[in-house]
Swiss-Prot record:
Catalyzes the isomerization between 2-isopropylmalate and 3-isopropylmalate, via the formation of 2-isopropylmaleate. The keyword Plastid does not apply. Heterodimer of LeuC and LeuD. InterPro entries: 3-IsopropMal_deHydase_ssu, Aconitase/3IPM_dehydase_swvl, AconitaseA/IPMdHydase_ssu_swvl, IPMI_Swivel, LeuD. Belongs to the LeuD family. LeuD type 1 subfamily. Its EC number is 4.2.1.33. Keywords: Amino-acid biosynthesis, Branched-chain amino acid biosynthesis, Leucine biosynthesis, Lyase. GO terms for cellular component: 3-isopropylmalate dehydratase complex. One of its GO terms (molecular function) is 3-isopropylmalate dehydratase activity. One of its GO terms (biological process) is L-leucine biosynthetic process. Pathway: Amino-acid biosynthesis; L-leucine biosynthesis; L-leucine from 3-methyl-2-oxobutanoate: step 2/4. This is 3-isopropylmalate dehydratase small subunit.
């Protein structure tokens, strides 16, 4: 079972860049592992650090600004997560501490991979995202409330509606990944296996 996602309130960091690809999110040299942990240290590695070893933080990169330390909601521009298909991208984001990414659009494969890893991708219009960028940049340290049950983002005195398809929403709300979904049918699977001819067992 994955962690259930119903509502999250968190600090927002504005990443004002369009077409952020998966190689920027987690560069290819860090993809040797197949476990989901340990990738947060290398999130946006080429932007966050000035050296190859990840020891000299780039003071001009927004994730390194002290007012955004501990951010769990990433605000981004269109076509977030484009590029090669790598599930390591949502792994890196969640391992770093992000629960939600808000953008006008997402690359299709990244969008699907996010739900598989309990990272909520929220799609709002360009105009709404522009509003949110202005709001966050004028109020560093601002928090948003993201309510998956109601499908709304609350930012200050404004509320923005978003839509997640019913199946993905059900899975997120109930903490169901592909394994969890399969286990829900464990009894039916066992019944089927018991009925198989002996030569198939």
């Amino acid at each position: 079972m994955a962690e259930k996602f119903t509502q999250h309130t968190g600090l927002v960091v504005p990443l004002d860049a369009a077409n952020v690809d998966t190689d920027a999110i987690i560069p290819k040299q860090f993809l040797q592992k197949v476990t989901r942990t340990g990738f947060g240290a290398h999130l946006f590695n080429d932007w966050r650090f000035l050296d190859d070893k990840g020891q000299q933080p780039n003071p001009d990169f927004v994730l390194n600004f002290p007012q955004y330390k501990g951010a769990s909601i990433l605000l981004a521009r269109e076509n977030f997560g484009c590029g090669s298909s790598r599930e390591h991208a949502p792994w890196a984001l969640t391992d770093y501490g992000f629960k939600v990414v808000i953008a006008p659009s997402f690359a299709d494969i990244f969008y699907g991979n996010s739900f598989n890893n309990q990272l909520l991708p929220v799609t709002l219009s360009d105009e709404q995202v522009d509003e949110l960028f202005k709001l966050v940049q004028a109020n560093p340290g601002m928090t948003f409330e993201v309510d998956l049950e109601a499908q709304v983002v609350k930012a200050g005195d404004k509320t923005y509606s978003f839509k997640i398809d019913d199946f993905r929403r059900h899975c997120m709300l109930n903490g169901l990944d592909s394994i969890g979904l399969t286990l829900q049918h464990g009894e039916a699977i066992s019944d089927y296996e018991r009925k198989l001819p002996a030569f198939m067992n």
